[in-house]
């Protein structure tokens, strides 16, 4: 199937997963326990979905080790991202971590000798501007600190390295072991989050003690159904992204996925959740669309 079609399907799956997650966070309790429970349910569903499609996939020692490393880095990224959001301003945290897409984007040229044209460089610059303009600054109680910056940088590096590992695996003779790679990574993620939930349930630490302004409990039928659907979306998104990272140029794939995903998220927030964008955010979205066009190097 055409890579453009696969990319569109991947981004659609990612968007649907994001919409479902937004629905959950708006109506049901949040907090670290709810997040870890969500991650455990989604990761387990994704692993089972991939297993159901592929059966018992073959896995070389290289794939097993890289998948475990991928799962560990993803876990560290999740923890440091949450800590950064807790310790400092949301706006700056969002921009800094979003810019991590530059790491896998430039890795194609630095590690795999991929060529980046002047038009694509312009697209990357516009993508950076899109990330910055799409976030509203000011009016936040939390201030920047050394602790916040340390967590931000850790999340930035981990997020970027996740993309590099995808590209790395798909650039080896073991690229056909996609299902094994993802199943192992999702299993690692499930075990980590499930272990946290178990410890939290036993010790009563990390559990939400209030109703969060009347929000419903996450342990209910509707949230579980949403998590199951989200897990299927995550499985499809990650499987397609892993494949595309090996067959598309890094300077095209990673900025398009991240920048295009941001534009789609902004559009969904307007159409579905009736959110209003500032003039600056509209400019950011327009730059994001132009940057994706330039990254595809149509000239």
Predicted regions and their residues:
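Polytopic alpha-helical membrane proteins, predominantly small-molecule transporters/carriers
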Residues: 1-299
């Amino acid at each position: 199937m055409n890579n453009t079609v696969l990319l569109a399907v991947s981004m659609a799956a990612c968007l649907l997963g994001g919409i479902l997650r937004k629905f959950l966070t708006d109506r049901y309790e949040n907090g670290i326990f709810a997040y870890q429970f969500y991650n455990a349910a989604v990761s387990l569903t994704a692993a089972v979905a991939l297993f159901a499609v592929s059966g018992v996939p073959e896995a070389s020692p290289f794939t097993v080790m890289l998948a475990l490393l991928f799962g560990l880095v993803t876990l560290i990224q999740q923890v440091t991202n949450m800590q950064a959001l807790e310790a400092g301003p949301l706006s700056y945290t969002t921009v800094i971590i979003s810019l991590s897409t530059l790491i896998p984007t430039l890795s194609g040229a630095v590690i795999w000798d991929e060529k980046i044209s002047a038009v694509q460089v312009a697209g990357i610059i516009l993508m950076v501007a899109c990330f910055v303009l799409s976030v509203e600054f000011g009016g936040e109680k939390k201030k920047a600190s050394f602790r916040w910056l340390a967590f931000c940088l850790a999340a930035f590096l981990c997020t970027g390295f996740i993309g590099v590992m995808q590209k790395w695996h798909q650039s080896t003779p073991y690229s056909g072991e996609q299902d094994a790679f993802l199943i192992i990574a999702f299993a690692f993620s499930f075990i980590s989050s499930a272990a946290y939930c178990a410890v939290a349930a036993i010790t009563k630490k990390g559990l939400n003690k209030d109703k969060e302004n009347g929000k419903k409990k996450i342990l209910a039928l509707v949230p579980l159904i949403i998590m199951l659907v989200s897990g299927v979306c995550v499985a499809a998104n990650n499987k397609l992204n892993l494949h595309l990272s090996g067959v598309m140029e890094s300077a095209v794939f990673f900025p398009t996925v991240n920048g295009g995903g941001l534009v789609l998220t902004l559009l969904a927030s307007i159409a579905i959740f009736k959110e209003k964008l500032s003039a600056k955010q509209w400019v950011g979205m327009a730059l994001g669309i132009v940057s994706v066009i330039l990254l595809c190097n149509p000239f």
